[in-house]
Amino acid sequence: SKVSPNEIHNHIVDDLIASKNGVIVLGEHLNSNPNSIAITNLISQIALVSDFKIANLTLSGNALSAEKANFIPGENGKDAISMFNDNSKAFLLMGVDCEYDFLDSKLASDCFDIEDVFVISLSSYEGQSVFKNADVILPMASFYETSGTHINFDGLVQSFSASIKSPGESKPGWKIIKVMADLLDLEGFDYVDSTQVKDEALQSSK
């Protein structure tokens, strides 16, 4: 639909034109907007015309890593809402609490509660929603109990080591995925430590 600019919009345009080293900052709320693709494309066009840079602030410190490693829905992929609405029958949740980590927690919970839907949860905590929604819970080491890598806002790769040993039978998330892949006879999961996972992920991002 056609939009008629008001005085505030005109002031923004004037500021953009007057600026020489401008940056358009996008927030996490954009990613949860149903029209995020259209908005992002529009912002990209504005940045191109005005010779501005775009800074995308994310809620998660590792969101850029997921994008760099192509660990996000592709052209034929599905986001969480699409999975819920398309009657998916199996879910693998990794460090996800249904009560807090979905924009529509009721939709997620209702989907997981369907009788023929199977849910595996890799979790570091004994949350009530995890017990309620998961058919199988695999104990996963927390952030402090595993090594790993982030890519920060500036694109800098930051690796870290475990601060403490994980308790009981809990294992790092990558190792749980590796063992599951081995049991399913899947190829490409011959990792010995997290640095190999990091190296392959960074290689795929080039």
Predicted regions and their residues:
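Non-catalytic alpha/beta scaffold blocks inside enzyme catalytic domains
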Residues: 1-206
